[in-house]
Every structure is written in C-alpha cells, then in structure tokens.
C-alpha cells in the first residue's frame, strides 16, 4: 500500500492540476536528504532531478534499511506512476481536491496488475483507453463504481459463471512490490456486472468454494469484490483492512465499506467488519475472528450433495 503522493506531484495549470510522475533519481536524492521536521510533509526539490515525494513517505520505498517498500528503481515503478498520471489528468482536480486525492492509500500490486493488463495484446484493456482509465480511477478510489470483471486488476482466471469471475493473483511474479513468501496463494472474485445476482449463480459460486477451496476463508476488503485467502493470513488482512478504513476516515476519504453477500463471506470475517464499521477498536474487532460462531442454517438446501466427496479439493493443503 502507498499514498498517491508517492508516485506523482501536482502542477497548477489555470484552475486545475496536471500530475507529473516522479523519476527514480529524484526519489533516491530525497531518501538521502536531511529534512527539517516542519518540511516532512512537503514535496522535496532535489534541485538536479526535479521534484520528489514528501520525506514523510520514505518508508514506502525499498532501501538498505527497509526491504518492505517499493522497488522504485525498476521500470515498473515508472509505468505505474505514468498510468496514475494518465488517469488523474483525464479528470479535473481543483485546488480544494488535490490534497485529498494525493493522500489516498492505494494497492501498489493492484496497479502493477493493471499495467500488465494494459500490455497484454489479448486483453480488453489493451484495446480500450477509456476502460483502462476507468479501471485505474476505480483502483485509486476516485470512482464510486466497484471493480467488476472488466475493470479488475486481473490474474489467472480459475472459475467463471454468468455472474462471477474468480482470479488467482500473480503477486509472486511482480517487480514493484512482489510477495516474497513462495507459499503465497490467494484469489479474488469479481462480479461480472454491478447488478442483482440470481440465487442459482450464487449457489454455483458457493458450491465451487466449498468443494474446491475448502482450506480458505472468503473475506472482503469492502470494495465490492471477494478475496479467498488462507486462514493463516486472515489476521494480517484484518490489520490492513482496519488500518486503511481508519486512515480513509481520518483523511476524509469516507467510502462505503461493502460487506457483500453474507452467505458467501466467512462468518467470522463478517462479524469483524461489522464491528469495525460500528467504530470498535482493532482489539475488540479481531477477537471476533477467533471466536466460535453459531453455525447458521444452510441458505441453499441440498448444496452439499452437488459434488461427490471424492471431488473435495486438496488446494491449500
């Protein structure tokens, strides 16, 4: 995760702003600079290489002292920064909006995936600039539309029906902020269209999840799509979701946290996110992840007979 101010800076032209991507040498200069505390939140002028991000975001970049940040010296950083600028420059951002826009925390890996989709000649985003920019504006939280299958970050499709598409995420192969744990495996489910979904299509999805992905929890980050994650990583997701939710509220980026279909979501996660929305502390919310929940009656009678027991998946073992 990183703020948009880590990728670009605003340049005032007439009554609105044009956004310009940072170059890696300017960032490198900022990372070595001694800056007064009062100037930590201001864009840094490297003198030689142009404007750099505010020093308060130093931890967002990979350095000798911090291996968890972005690999900003890779070509992928520039591609992501350029893509963000293209999207922001396609809309009008005024002086009253600019601070709010740049403070938004975005998924670095999501944006890298959109770059990969853009470069894939077989992908619809390669052929449609309008759909590409729409996908980016959704990814950076500027659009109120949810991420659907056409505007999704992408990955490898492992399941699809008339209503849903399930993607295996490819973060292990990333350049900008790769997942280093070689045991990482995670999926994302997007709706094909943002409209009411028939019970039969929900039932098909639940059957697929129950039998092929029974070692995983189905959760949501509140953005209109599902994530299918290992139970061992749920607490980590909870920390990130809670931190982003609080940060957005603090900065005035109040977005509706979409709890999605309770029949699909893991019971404990639904309880966690509901508690978070009520304003409870992280400690109180996380207790619900490890609490034994009363099993609800099956909303789809006969679902367990849809597949034979010898078809139960070994994925995740």
From Swiss-Prot:
GO biological process: viral genome replication
Similarity remark: Belongs to the rotavirus NSP2 family.
Localization per Swiss-Prot or TrEMBL: Host cytoplasm
A Pfam family this chain is assigned to: Rota_NS35_N
Annotated region described as RNA-binding, given as residue ranges: 205-241
The protein's required cofactors: Mg(2+)
Its biological purpose: Participates in replication and packaging of the viral genome. Plays a crucial role, together with NSP5, in the formation of virus factories (viroplasms), which are large inclusions in the host cytoplasm where replication intermediates are assembled and viral RNA replication takes place. Displays ssRNA binding, NTPase, RNA triphosphatase (RTPase) and ATP-independent helix-unwinding activities. The unwinding activity may prepare and organize plus-strand RNAs for packaging and replication by removing interfering secondary structures.
GO molecular function: ATP binding; metal ion binding; nucleoside diphosphate kinase activity; ribonucleoside triphosphate phosphatase activity; RNA binding
Cellular component aspect of the GO annotation: host cell cytoplasm
Name by which UniProt lists this protein: Non-structural protein 2
Top-rank taxon, per record: Viruses
UniProt subunit comment: Homooctamer. Interacts with VP1; this interaction is weak. Interacts with NSP5; this interaction leads to up-regulation of NSP5 phosphorylation and formation of viral factories. Interacts with host DCP1A, DCP1B, DDX6, EDC4 and EIF2S1; these interactions are probably part of the sequestration of some host SGs and PBs proteins in viral factories.
Species of the source: Rotavirus A (strain RVA/Monkey/United States/RRV/1975/G3P5B[3])
Chain residues that bind ATP: 107-109, 188, 221-223, 227
Enzyme Commission number(s) of this protein: 3.6.4.-
């Amino acid at each position: 995760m990183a703020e948009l101010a880590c990728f670009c800076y605003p340049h005032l032209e007439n009554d609105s702003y044009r956004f310009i991507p940072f170059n890696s040498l300017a960032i490198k200069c900022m990372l070595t600079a001694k800056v007064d505390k009062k100037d930590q939140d201001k864009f840094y002028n490297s003198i030689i290489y142009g404007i750099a991000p505010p020093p308060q975001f130093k931890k967002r970049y990979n350095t000798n002292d911090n291996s968890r940040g972005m690999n900003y010296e890779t070509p992928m950083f520039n591609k992501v920064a350029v893509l963000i600028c293209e999207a922001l420059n396609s809309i009008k951002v005024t002086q009253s909006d600019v601070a709010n826009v740049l403070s938004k925390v975005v998924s670095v890996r999501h944006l890298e995936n959109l770059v990969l989709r853009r470069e894939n000649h077989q992908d619809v985003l390669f052929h449609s600039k309008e759909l590409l920019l729409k996908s980016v504006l959704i990814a950076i939280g500027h659009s109120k539309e949810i991420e659907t299958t056409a505007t999704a970050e992408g990955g490898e499709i492992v399941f699809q029906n008339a209503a849903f598409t399930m993607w295996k995420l490819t973060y292990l192969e990333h350049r900008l902020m790769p997942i280093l744990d070689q045991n990482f495996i995670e999926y994302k489910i997007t709706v094909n269209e943002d409209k009411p979904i028939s019970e039969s299509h929900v039932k098909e999805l639940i059957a697929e999840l129950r039998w092929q992905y029974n070692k995983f929890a189905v959760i949501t980050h509140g953005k209109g799509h599902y994530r299918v994650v290992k139970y061992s990583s749920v607490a980590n997701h909870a920390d990130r979701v809670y931190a982003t939710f609080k940060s957005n509220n603090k900065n005035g980026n109040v977005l509706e946290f979409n709890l999605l279909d309770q029949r699909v979501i893991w019971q404990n996660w639904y309880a966690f996110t509901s508690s978070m929305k009520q304003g409870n502390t992280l400690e109180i919310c996380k207790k619900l992840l490890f609490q034994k929940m009363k099993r609800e009656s099956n909303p789809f009678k006969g679902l367990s007979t849809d597949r034979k027991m010898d078809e139960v998946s070994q994925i995740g073992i």
